[in-house]
Amino acid sequence: AARSLAQALGRKADNLFIAGLLHDIGRLLMVVVAPDDYARVIATAREQDCPLQQAEMSAFGYDHADVGAALAQRWNFPEDIRQALAFHHAPSGGTPGGPAGLIHYADAIAKALDLDGAEDTQLPHLDPATIDALDLDQHTLARVLAETQEGFDHCSLLLG
């Protein structure tokens, strides 16, 4: 979704594609470091019908975006990737039309198409400033949705 969206907006897609792949890497680290605690976070999110990041904050005092941003900083990732990982759930913390906003929107597209396989069953709230900043028309959005689904289907065939 991130690559298709970046291309549709005339942005350089390489780092945005990488940011899209890595935007939830903090979640992976949290699962690896504290699997039992994270299983409880997932259960809490389901029981309370709340976003996973809200349940993460309640349980840990930080969320996967914070962990991902810390990893990106430690690994000396470019600033646009760090911003995307840090603010993909709250793009107004960065620049709504910037990398975080684009990943925020791409994440919503992946969730809407049910491509993410996430335990989180809620569609993310799209940040209004991001919607305004990216200014996608219906035709472009339809094309991005179709390209994203097609790309996912192609990768699924390749990976079996």
Residue ranges and their predicted role:
Residues 3, 7-160:
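Metal-dependent nucleotide-binding catalytic modules
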